[in-house]
Amino acid sequence: MEFIEKIREGYAAFGAYQTWYRVTGDLSSGRTPLVVIHGGPGCTHDYVDAFKDVAASGHAVIHYDQLGNGRSTHLPDKDPSFWTVGLFLEELNNLLDHLQISDNYAILGQSWGGMLGSEHAILQPKGLRAFIPANSPTCMRTWVSEANRLRKLLPEGVHETLLKHEAAGTYQDPEYLAASRVFYDHHVCRVNPWPEEVARTFAQVDADPTVYHAMSGPTEFHVIGSLKDWKSIGRLSAINVPTLVISGRHDEATPLVVKPFLDEIADVRWALFEDSSHMPHVEERQACMGTVVKFLDEVCSVPHNVLKAG
């Protein structure tokens, strides 16, 4: 039976700005909705669009474009200091309030989205029911050191080409871009050619890299922005909701990168997708969605109004 999606889009006012969002499914279904936080920082919802499949289970799915990206307000003239973790935490809380789901929701954060989701979950918000960090760092220094290790395993000459242009600051040189793409094809998305929604996200980052450059850097693995010293290690034990860690066998988020989630969070489980890198939701879409739905059904199975009554 084909699932006919109920979809609505809108904008949440965030101060003087607008946050675009999309709801797939019914927020009044009684089942905990899932908020999907995209990566970057500076990407868009497009490449994580596949998580809309979860709505067929009865859990409504909310996608949104973070400020500065996609269909939300762009601010290319803002100083890099404007773009902070705190800003994006405020935007997330504002969206939860706008959708009137702040008393009952789950979060799935992919890559940077899982970093932001971790910061949110560490604060123990009363309505958070479950947390899914997908392919996410816990320490940017570990992330970079693991990326450097993976780079050295790429075909001969790729790592050396990357080093040469990073030293020179020539990040737009076609040679650097081609070498970067080799890393991406091994450790970011192994589907060839890239699905249209993945290519669309990268095209939008290229069109306005304001947030990506300010907080991360020119590539996934050369982190020189404001997040370069970020870490959640030592704070993750504050996360007090059931947690599902997702990663891929070929992921730039290596087992060493995600290990602190498993070490520090009390109620945690790990799904490792053998044929995926950084995007199991694209590379093993059906299996990934099934894993997410099974987890949500297990940990959010009791209707929220029953919990409240108890």
Curated annotation (Swiss-Prot):
The alphabetized UniProt keywords are: Hydrolase
Q: Which residues form the AB hydrolase-1 domain?
A: 33-284
Catalytic activity annotation: (S)-piperazine-2-carboxamide + H2O = (S)-piperazine-2-carboxylate + NH4(+); L-prolinamide + H2O = L-proline + NH4(+)
Q: Which InterPro entries does the UniProt entry name for this protein?
A: AB_hydrolase_1 (IPR000073), AB_hydrolase_fold (IPR029058), AB_hydrolase_sf (IPR050266), Peptidase_S33 (IPR002410), Pro_imino_pep (IPR005945)
Gene3D superfamilies reported for this sequence: alpha/beta hydrolase
Q: Which GO terms describe its molecular function?
A: peptidase activity
EC number(s) on record? 3.5.1.101
Instruction: List, in alphabetical order, the GO biological process terms annotated in this UniProt record.
Output: proteolysis
**How is the enzymatic or functional activity of this protein modulated?**
Completely inhibited by ZnSO(4), ZnCl(2), AgNO(3), CdCl(2) and HgCl(2). Partially inhibited by PbCl(2), NiCl(2) and CoCl(2). Unaffected by LiBr, H(2)BO(3), NaCl, MgSO(4), AlCl(3), KCl, CaCl(2), CrCl(3), MnCl(2), FeSO(4), Fe(NH(4))(2)(SO(4))(2), CuSO(4), RbCl, Na(2)MoO(4), (NH(4))(6)Mo(7)O(24), SnCl(2), CsCl and BaCl(2). Completely inhibited by phenylhydrazine, but not by the other carbonyl reagents hydroxylamine, hydrazine, D,L-penicillamine and D-cycloserine. Unaffected by the chelating agents o-phenanthroline, 8-hydroxyquinoline, enthylenediaminetetraacetic acid and alpha,alpha'-dipyridyl.
In the UniProt record, which is one GO cellular component term?
A: membrane
Q: Which residues catalyse the reaction?
A: 111 (nucleophile), 251, 278 (proton donor)
The residues the entry assigns to the signal sequence are none
Pfam family membership, one: Abhydrolase_1
Family the entry assigns = Belongs to the peptidase S33 family.
Function, as annotated? Hydrolyzes L-prolinamide, L-proline-p-nitroanilide, L-alaninamide, L-methioninamide, piperidine-2-carboxamide and piperazine-2-carboxamide. Has a much lower activity towards piperazine-2-tert-butylcarboxamide. Does not hydrolyze dipeptides and D-prolinamide.
What is the protein's given name? L-amino acid amidase
Q: Which organism is it from?
A: Pseudomonas fluorescens (strain SBW25)
